[in-house]
Amino acid sequence: MSRKYFGTDGIRGRVGEFPITPDFVLKLGWAVGMAFRRQGNCRVLIGKDTRSSGYMFESAFEAGLSASGADTLLLGPMPTPGIAYLTRTFHAEAGVVISASHNPHDDNGIKFFSGQGTKLPDDVELMIEELLDAPMTVVESARLGKVSRINDAAGRYIEFCKSSVPTSTDFNGLKVVLDCANGATYKIAPSVFRELGAEVTVLAASPNGLNINDKCGSTHLDGLQAAVVEHHADLGIAFDGDGDRVMMVDHTGAVVDGDELLFLIARDLQESGRLQGGVVGTLMSNLGLELALQELHIPFVRAKVGDRYVMAELLARNWMLGGENSGHIVCCQNTTTGDAIIAALQVLMALKHRGQTLAEARQGIRKCPQVLINVRFKGENDPLEHPSVKEASVRVTEQMGGRGRVLLRKSGTEPLVRVMVEGDEEASVRAHAEQLAKIVSEVCA
């Protein structure tokens, strides 16, 4: 059964446009409360990023929960993985994240964690969707849900992040620039790295409700690259708006993406005898990652794009490490979802163990040229099912003669078709990608 409201990572869209409206979010809160109250008493945690609309949707969702009889614990601004962690530690039935991740401020969304801190199973999402289409009822006044605030939520999560590295860890002498995307990590990330001894320069840590991800964060690295060089820093770390993606910059200003970071962590875990199984990537993972892991005899498999699918594959195989080139990295030995701060700490530990700079350590992986072009589309028709697009994809694949990959996929969070071509020669890869993107664009017009 297909899902009506849920995408690959909750429900997301433009603020004020269905379903990202106060009335829908109130009904959603009620539906979530009703779904989890079927199992008995229900407590739900709510956290959010720094968008101005987050306050409106927090109030609406909280009202819906109360109407269902479920209790609410408010966390305030908190990285997505922090909400997953606190949902587990407070033994809540569910955690709610009000965020649109790396999207601009005029988007927002709602995503969920189970009581174990993992993404909701499909059957629970379908139950919530059924309730959304049912008439809303309100419990009697004596049974309305209560609301309270967890005042030390940030401190708890800071200590959890620090506990992901050995207690003897000291980054004294390490100069780091952090780009907090004016998002949910703006207070927490600087505290974590400073308390572990690093010398920290902070960018984009003054959220005003409208500047989240605005020319900053993991999808806009220009400012971080310049700052690392200007401050003669050892490296730079960029988070996205809700703190579940991380990208890094070496001391020369060169970008180190999620595939490279995943390799550095995997190699360190293997060298220290801590790697369990192999590594899970996605269909978008660079071929160079697969080849580099192959050289180390580390198994590698690809999941569908989306950290929920990476996590599902990890659980199915009982492996501990996976991620995406966008910077979602899941370290199951520490957490149950992509955690940007913890992933960054694991990379710093890998550098410390080898006594290398980030620029030196990344030489262990040679990425294949890869070009990704996003094509926006409207309407209900699936452009990937159009004969012209299918024929072009087959033709380009044949032209590459087995020396590359073509991947066309729709984004699970935005109305985009992602055109990805990968091969051994950059000019031909770019030409093939532009050729495919042009055909997809014509079909979408």
Curated annotation (Swiss-Prot):
Active site: 101 (phosphoserine intermediate)
Gene3D superfamilies reported in the protein's UniProt record: Alpha-D-Glucose-1,6-Bisphosphate, subunit A, domain 3, Alpha-D-phosphohexomutase, C-terminal domain
Catalysed transformations (reactions): alpha-D-glucosamine 1-phosphate = D-glucosamine 6-phosphate
GO cellular component terms listed in the entry, alphabetical order: cytosol
Entries under NCBIfam families matching the protein: glmM, PRK10887.1
Alphabetized HAMAP family for the sequence: GlmM_B
Protein name stated in the entry: Phosphoglucosamine mutase
Gene: glmM
